[in-house]
Amino acid sequence: MNQKNSLGLNKCFLDLDNPFQLFQRWFEEAKKKEINDPNALALGTANKEGIPSVRMVLLKGHSEKGFVFYTNLNSQKGNEIKENPNATMCFHWKSLLRQIRIVGTLKQVDDQTADEYYNSRAYDSRIGAWASKQSSILHSRDELLDAIENYKKKYNDKDNVPRPSHWSGWNLTPSTIEFWLDGDNRIHERLKYSLDKNGSWTKSLLSP
């Protein structure tokens, strides 16, 4: 029989009052077990009319301040976030039979943070941020490839490619974080952390 924590859950849930510590533990385990992109997450956003959309992005930073990803600010997701900052993230690690769902609000990171991450990227990725008008219609693939070549000529010094003003990061400040573990016969285990008005986290067990 699996060992249980004080709430009767599998020992992998630990006994932590801070969800960020539990996230860090699960994330480290995912990086060892998950074959591809353990930092991949489904990001759900909605426009001002409430029409939702979802796509996969990569987590590029996390702390008790939130969870960070980067994108073109003029993309569909970028425009939706400007209209409606409420969003959700979902990590699903098949190798661990675990999932983490996060709900919160998005805020753009500061320029220094965006610059530091942008400058850490490969040259071709930095050029791509200039060349791609993300989510806009292309008349042909060659249109994009030509733009890439033109920006490579413009920024031929690989150590000096400035960050486009339309490219930055978003930080999701969570209000709830739910941890999920697959169980036999669909009797899954769910632990939800909710942020109260005093800034403290409370834990709740949820029915599967």
Write out the residue ranges for each language-model feature:
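Binding-site signature for planar aromatic cofactors or substrates
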Residues: 1-208
